[in-house]
Amino acid sequence: MKPIVQVSLDLTDIKEAMEMAHTAMRAGVDWLEAGTPFILAEGLHGVRALRKEFPNIPVVADLKTMDGGYLEAQMMAKAGATHVVVMARAHPETIKVVVQAGKDCGVTVMGDNLGCEDMVAGARMLEDLGCDMVIHHIGYDERRGIAAAGKVPPNPLDQLKAVVDAVGVPVQAVGGLSLEQAIASPSYGAPLVVIGAPLAIDADSFSRGAGNVEEVLRKICEKVHAYGDVAITPRKN
């Protein structure tokens, strides 16, 4: 699979989100993500706006579905999302119906292992239940709370290779990665590179970050795309 650069639009203002999306497209980004704060602020209107503005670009709707899975996935698909996200900590039946909605509506289902006691087992379970891709995710509050207690928070790269080896679907690492670490994800076998805070988004205010975002994104895209194909190896058991 060719490596993909995805920009997470974790913004609460639709004008800022659209400006960031246009910046990302000029820089060579492949996918746009309607981040959770953006969806909470703008709802289906925000997803529809992204689809209208960028008719040929994949749009990930990061709703973090925990229940009502079929309806939520269906609604996002009808609004124009090409990818939806369901949480591993949801009931297995929720994951199953999101997967079914993905098949019925023609969207890709990404399963997120945020909060799993065993992150590798959570990733395997998501694949077993039919998810097309796995998000290996260390949460913002988890990282911040552990750091505030004077401890070193976990990093997605700590277990990324183990997650990649455990599943036979594409993997994305999310949560607290530096730009250099995010760019290195394909070297672990994870072709889906997501960029959000701290480059594009101020993680505390959920507003656009400062600096020459377009130029930095362009360099990131060049480095990630230079990896070439990343092998996705089917599971052996």
Model-derived features: positions:
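Conserved N-terminal beta1-alpha1 strand-loop-helix module at the mouth
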Residues: M1-Y70, L126, R208-K219
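General structural feature for long, well-ordered alpha-helical segments within catalytic domains
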Residues: E16, M20, G28, E42-G46, ...
